[in-house]
Amino acid sequence: MKNWLLFITFILLIKTFFCQLNNELIWSTNTFYPKTVRGINPLENGEHYSSLKLRNGSQEIIKFSYKKNKELGVLFSSKDFNDIKFYDYKVSNDQKWILIATQTESIYRHSSKSYYYVYNTKNRRLESIADTSKGKQRLAEFSPDNNKIAYVRNNNLYYINLNDFKEIQVTTNGEINNIINGATDWVYEEEFSIDKGFYWSNSGDKIAYYVFDESKVKEFQMKMYGNIYPTHYKFKYPKAGEKNSNIGINVYNLFSKRTIPFDLGKNSDIYVPRIMWSKKKDELIVFKMNRLQNKLELLSGRFYSDMPNNTGVRINKLYEETSNTYLDIHDNTIFINENDMVWTSEKDGYNHIYIIDYNNGNEKQITNGQWDVTEVYGYDENNKNIYFQAAKESPTRREIYSVNIETKEIDLLSNGKGTNEAEFSNNFKYFINKYSNADNPYFFTLRDKSGKVLFELENNEELISKMLDFDLVKKEFITVPNEDGIELNAWIMKPTKLDTISKHPLLMFVYGGPGINTVNDEWSGMNYFWFQSLVKKGFVVASVDSRGTGYRGKEFKHSTYLQLGKYETRDQISAAQYFGNLNFIDRSKIGIFGWSYGGYMSSLCITKGADIFNSAIAVAPVTNWRYYDNIYTERFMRTPAENGHNYDTNSPINHVDKLKGNYLLIHGTADDNVHFQNSLEMVNELVNNNKDFDFFAYPDKNHGIYGGMTRLHLYNKMNKFLENNLQQ
């Protein structure tokens, strides 16, 4: 009996040891990584989809039936080819070919380059799409007729015919930091979220593509360490008020070998955030936007195969939208026939769905109300339904809906209270629903078009069970008032036993950038467990969505226009004062932490709110909007020449004299997004004002500051800072 008790005690001690929630467990193991359904690819007939699975150490692309949730066969297995590692794949419409990307190498946030191989499902041969000695390719994509693949290499556009694998070079003038064909420049990739710059026509006989002339864009240099002599990485980065790339749109005819330019007009200081082919034969739609990003025109050009040499293309304006502030670029445009398109707009004060007849300009609003449509998934011609995601129940949640374009009747297709995302079959008879909430990881279900659950694909039962061992607290969703009496959405995480005598330190987590929320009823990954670990140390953790954040209508989101940082800072200060008045919060020990825009916010709060905040952590912060890229900055601030006063008034570098508390500044030296320059200029001002602070740089790390033991080191450093300044 005694030995048995000793054994039980030993087991309990072991369990206790391994159930200690700490940074090592969070950041250097895969203990808390949720399972997911990987590589979902709806197949052409609408009855099947493919998914990526790891089985017995090999990667497999599996074909599934939606109706039966049954494996129908393995389309491709890496074990047949020496377990070749691939990171992405595409299946041709006829399922004859599979395109896989290997040895993928990141370039910037969205972009990468790979060696691409194409697999013939009939003869089971795997071939490189091009001579690998010429370098890696980018953005490879099948033509709609399944006979060709287009791609970019070294800033030039190419395609191959799959019948003979002959490579055809479309452009020849591509040059790094000078001319880009078929891809986008840095600022388009970052701020318009596109890196692909070519698009097949519906018939597969033409390719429309971007041409970026970067020659007049100023160059930014980053030092890269790790060698005896540091090297310089150079790329074109247009900062606020500076020159952009000159943009051209060309259409290449594969049969005539001719390239025809799309006339964008005389004004070259414009943006072209999207191009796409309509359902009309040979009609290209170009989205043209002015530099202030408050006027958007949709232009049409027809490119007929039999067009005589040197004949220009007639350009027609199909649609125009303007704003007194700015317009968001979205991917909700769907051409449903030769005359009508689905469109979303904030023109009535909230983001809603419209049907636009682009022949005569007539429009019909399909959804309305004091809520925002967040994404449009597609249009089902058979039942006249548009499928979409919306923050209809709350700005903190997302649901899946359908709406009939004739009756305007809306049906709810999801049932989980939290965040729902959908991947629809090509015939819209089925969709895979990805659901999570603030305290539970992803739950995948296969549903029919009415939302009825047909099958459960992944429930993350193992992770949920594991989480029970750590006695985690719940995120509580609340509202807090700002100085003007506006109720702001927030969440709070509190220790199970609150100490109203000694009280608790508070850490506020902030982002606060335009349209971006941190108060979401969804799974938030590893930061969720880090916050939980702080709660176990006695911290209260909270986050507040200030003015300027999303899904509360245009007025709320656009209230920070021309004055970034002003109202957001006031709201965070108001929230800190509110929390400080709670009987379990030590108002002398309030800290704030943010990354990127959040680092900008935490830097403003510790200076402008010096009497409220005791400590602040700023990771990779913008410290002066003059240092940031022009598309983002000018969208919300206009140019420094037009709005210089507000650039300066709300820049942290101009408020360091107010600093009283503890300030930790962290940045990666190879941050291509928010340049290391921002932190160095902040350091200069802090030194000039004789302010004590902590500063740490991660050599050769980008905006994400990760790789190897980097994240563990970073979070250990932040833990030590918080414990030293908020707990002692």
Task: Locate predicted features.
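Beta-propeller domains
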Residues: V211-E363
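Beta-strand C-termini and the immediately following turn/loop, strongest in propeller blades
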Residues: S50-N56, S65, K90-V91, L99-H110, ...
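Blade-loop segments of beta-propeller domains
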Residues: N69-K96, I100, E105, S133-K136, ...
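Short loop/turn segments that connect beta-strands within beta-propeller blades
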Residues: Y66-K68, N120-R124, L162-F165, N253-K257, ...
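Serine-hydrolase catalytic core recognition
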Residues: E219, P273-M276, K281, F287, ...
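Predominantly five- to eight-bladed beta-propeller fold
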Residues: T29, N69-L72, Q103-Y108, S112-Y115, ...
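Non-catalytic accessory segments flanking enzyme active sites
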Residues: P34-N41, E47-I61, G73-L75, Y87-K90, ...
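Signature of short aromatic-glycine-proline-rich micro-motifs recurring in repeat-based ectodomains
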Residues: P34-I40, I84-K90, A183-S203, R274-I275, ...
